[in-house]
């Protein structure tokens, strides 16, 4: 921010300390080799339709990485060599900080669209929820956060890929290719309900 150039910071010491105490996964892109997170490229909580986790190490880039930042999105690369989680930042109100003219939360429709266009595109949503001038959340904002969370839970409580008593048939998955033609990575793995299996 303003005046920051007047202070000399030992950023490398910060990075080393955070890395030692917290590991690789909590430093944002300017953490150099220790970075595990990158900014999505906008402050609207929106990720590109095709967002990749990997980025490319680039010694010529300002922060050491080419994150394919274009059109307001950090898109990443399918063939990148460094995994950087694409963090989608957004505000629940019109501003990052609370104010008497910035205390109306977004609608549940807007928040839902934001969720599906961030998390649904492979980027965790970091939703800023500012406290008021008393250090508490305004009731309208707190209610909105609770309702938003409940809407997400309700949206996914019925696994639409499973058969049910009403006659819904279980989903199947097929793919034109599988890694090394190995069925251990077959398309059916996207539907087996296990967190440690996958299709590739």
Each language-model region and where it sits:
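Mature catalytic domains of secreted/periplasmic carbohydrate-active enzymes
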Residues: 1-189, 197-198
């Amino acid at each position: 921010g303003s005046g920051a150039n007047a202070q000399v910071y030992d950023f490398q010491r910060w990075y080393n300390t955070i890395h030692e105490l917290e590991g690789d996964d909590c430093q944002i892109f300017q953490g150099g080799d220790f970075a595990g997170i990158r900014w999505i490229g906008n402050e609207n909580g929106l990720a590109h339709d095709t967002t990749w986790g990997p980025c490319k190490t680039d010694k010529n880039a300002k922060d050491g990485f080419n994150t394919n930042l274009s059109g307001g999105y950090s898109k990443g690369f399918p063939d990148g060599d460094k995994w950087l989680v694409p963090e989608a930042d957004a505000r629940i109100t019109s501003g990052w900080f609370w104010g008497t003219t910035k205390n109306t939360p977004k609608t549940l429709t807007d928040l839902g669209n934001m969720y599906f266009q961030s998390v649904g595109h492979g980027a965790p949503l970091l939703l800023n929820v500012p406290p008021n001038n008393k250090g508490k959340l305004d009731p309208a904002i707190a209610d909105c956060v609770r309702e938003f969370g409940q809407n997400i839970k309700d949206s996914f409580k019925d696994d639409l890929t499973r058969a049910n008593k009403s006659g819904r048939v279980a989903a199947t998955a097929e793919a034109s290719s599988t890694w090394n033609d190995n069925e251990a990575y077959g398309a059916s793995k996207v539907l087996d309900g296990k967190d440690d299996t996958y299709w590739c």
